[in-house]
From Swiss-Prot:
Keyword Glycosyltransferase attributed: yes
Top-level taxonomy: Bacteria, Bacillati, Bacillota, Bacilli, Bacillales
Known EC number: 2.4.1.18
GO MF term list: 1,4-alpha-glucan branching enzyme activity; cation binding; hydrolase activity, hydrolyzing O-glycosyl compounds
Keyword ATP-binding included in the entry's annotation: no
Name this polypeptide is given: 1,4-alpha-glucan branching enzyme GlgB
Organism name: Bacillus subtilis (strain 168)
Positions annotated as active site in the UniProt record: 309 (nucleophile), 352 (proton donor)
GO biological process, one term: glycogen biosynthetic process
Quaternary data: Monomer.
Pathway named in the protein's UniProt entry: Glycan biosynthesis; glycogen biosynthesis
Length: 627
């Protein structure tokens, strides 16, 4: 990442809001100048009367390293010879009223381990990537046609050493990656890993946007972690927060003594809900900073996607009783997504949005925001509300399951059971389920199975794969001791089999964003709380028949309408004894019988498992499948 002194063109683009590689200009960069090696520093501080560089190399007295002002809009630079790598530094900002503030570099690419807050000089060059096969594979197929089953995790609490130390990026490469591979997840999604001062903010209140947190090691170790994920066919998505930032004194807040990265007006600037400051998305220089940041992570860390946090907080002005659209934010999101699509068309842009904003995943040129995917918060809330309802009462809220298919194809959706649903007293997925010990596990398997066959990409939070009983405890590691309990072992086996089935079943992902991929068989059976539907493949005769029973009642000799006059074999049943179920499965192929049922030309007779999902595949029998 070779730096250069600011050119007039760079300066123009930065202030216009389109210097999308601003990290090549700002920050600290190794240079050789006039036969001397050192680091060049560049910072934006338009309200400062003077800016200096302070660090270990001058005993933290910046008076001998005063920066030069490049233009009237506040870009400052300085080359300091003799500085090596991993030198600590900050900017000594002299405000208009003479106050001196020590600030970390907004474009720092490496930082001290908290609670220390200095930036570190660092050279990002030199890592030799080995993920060429992965990159070629990503570019070869349309993004929407790929299987996506995401494992969301918090690096600080996935696993810890016995003395409480975090696992490093290197150690996670050796432990996390094989674990993800074993379970069959296609992607991991990391809660924010850019630098943040407070552990319990989980990274969502950050300030070092270009600096991977040093809690887990240096930047090159994170590169290697991502590289090794790719070599194992695992994509890496980052949680990314372009809406607000923490207000710690060393960070972006009031950077040069006045609002700079944040809005000028207090009611717009202060995020009273989270105690943070909102980015001024009407300021072109902030556009350059944030859009460059997304491009930076894609370029230098080969990141495969961004889950954009709290989009509702971005789209609407904060701290108001009624929602009012922020036009600057709308323009920013469109610009961000359009830029990313042009530069990295295979990198997913995912909106965490709980609003009814139209066309979140629509093309920018057609009036949309330009995201690839949107979290389906409505589906998540409805399904969890339904599952937490006692089974005998579920017939009264049948619509909580059926309603999602009225809008499932209006956007490109991700179905999320995220960290937000298993923390702060909300209970774990398993413990949300009503009933006794066995019933909780049965409904947990049904829930994951139903999510897997519902249109949309998938996401679960760490611990859900083995049915952790306790909700997420962010200061502790996951309850790995549960692996010694048979039902948790079997839950893990179920998750692995379910995800392997998903990855092998193109029916479930190749065109799950198209309405013709789904058809109800019987959506009106509220008395028995049984739902049946079909997932169609792209070729004639490709079909999965799916039956979900949300009560503990077993049904034998149950008739289900089917689309083709052929045989059906059960390819997955959550009630299998292998998974801890009661064994109410369909061992033999089921032959379709003549006679219309459920508006289908024929039907099969089968066993319906308690609290279970049964997935049947249509198979050819003596020639072509007949409809």
């Amino acid at each position: 990442m070779a730096a250069a002194s600011p050119t007039a063109h760079d300066v123009y683009l930065f202030h216009e809001g389109s210097l999308f590689k601003s990290y090549q200009l700002f920050g600290s960069h190794y240079r050789e100048l006039n036969g001397k090696s050192g680091y060049e520093f560049c910072v934006w501080a338009p309200h400062a009367s003077e800016v200096r560089v302070a660090g270990d190399f001058n005993s933290w007295s910046g008076e001998e390293h005063v920066m030069h002002r490049v233009n009237d809009n506040g870009i400052w630079t300085l080359f300091i010879p003799g500085i090596g790598e991993k030198e600590r530094y900050k900017y000594e900002i002299v405000t208009n009223n003479g106050e001196i503030r020590l600030k970390a570099d907004p474009y720092a690419i490496y930082s001290e381990v908290r609670p220390n807050t200095a930036s570190l000089t660092y050279d990002l060059e030199g890592y030799s990537w080995q993920d060429q096969k992965w990159q070629k594979k990503q570019k070869a197929k349309t993004l929407y046609e790929k299987p996506v089953f995401i494992y969301e995790l918090h690096l600080g609490s996935w696993k810890k050493h016995s003395d409480g130390r975090h696992y490093s990026y290197k150690e996670l490469s050796q432990t996390l990656i094989p674990y993800i591979k074993k379970h069959g997840f296609t992607h991991i999604e990391l809660l924010p890993v850019y630098e943040h001062p407070y552990d319990r903010s989980w990274g969502y209140q950050g300030t070092g946007y270009y600096s991977p947190t040093s809690r887990f090691g240096p930047p090159h170790d994170l590169m290697k972690f991502v590289d090794e994920c790719h070599q194992q066919n695992i994509g890496v998505i980052l949680d990314w927060v372009p809406g607000h930032f923490c207000k710690d004194a060393h960070g972006l807040y009031m950077f040069d003594g006045e609002p700079l990265y944040e809005y000028k007006e207090e009611r717009d600037r202060e995020n009273w809900l989270w105690g943070t400051a909102n980015f001024d998305l009407g300021k072109p220089e902030v556009h350059s900073f944030l859009i460059s940041n997304a491009l930076y992570w894609a370029e230098f860390y080969h990141i495969d996607g961004f889950r954009v946090d709290a989009v509702a907080n971005i789209l609407y002005w904060p701290n108001q009783d009624e929602r009012h659209t922020n036009p600057y934010a709308v323009d920013f999101l469109k610009k961000l997504n359009q830029t990313m699509r042009e530069a990295y068309p295979h990198v997913m842009m995912i909106a965490e949005d709980s609003t009814e904003w139209p066309q979140v995943t629509g093309a920018v040129e057609e009036g949309g925001l330009g995201f690839h995917y949107k979290w389906n918060m409505g589906w998540m809330n409805d399904v969890l509300k339904y599952m937490e309802t006692p089974p005998e009462e579920r017939r009264h809220c049948h619509q909580l399951i059926s309603f999602s298919l009225l809008y499932a194809f209006s956007e490109h959706f991700v179905l999320p059971f995220s960290h937000d649903e298993v923390v702060y007293g909300k209970k774990s997925l398993l413990n949300k389920m009503p009933g006794d010990y066995w019933q909780k596990f049965a409904q947990y398997r049904l829930l994951l199975g139903y999510m897997t066959v519902h249109p949309g990409k998938k996401l679960i939070f760490m611990g859900s794969e083995f049915a952790q009983f306790d909700e997420w405890k962010d200061t502790e590691q996951l309850d790995w001791f549960l692996d010694s309990f048979p039902m948790h072992q079997k839950a893990s086996v179920f998750t692995q089999d379910l995800l392997r089935f998903y990855q092998k079943s193109k029916i479930l992902y190749e065109h799950d964003h198209r309405a013709q991929s789904f058809e109800w068989i019987d959506v009106h059976n509220d008395e028995q709380s049984i739902f049946s539907f079909i997932r169609y493949g792209q070729k004639h005769g490709e079909a999965l028949v799916i039956i979900c029973n949300f009560t503990p009642v077993v049904y034998h000799q149950y008739d289900v309408g089917v689309p083709f006059f052929t045989q059906y074999i059960e390819v997955l049943n959550s009630d299998s004894e292998t998974y801890g179920g009661s064994g109410q499965i369909n061992k033999k192929p089921l032959s379709a019988k003549k006679g219309a049922l459920h508006h289908k030309p024929c039907y099969i007779t089968m066993t319906i498992p308690p609290y279970g999902i049964s997935i049947l595949r249509a198979v050819k029998k003596r020639g072509e499948i007949k409809r």
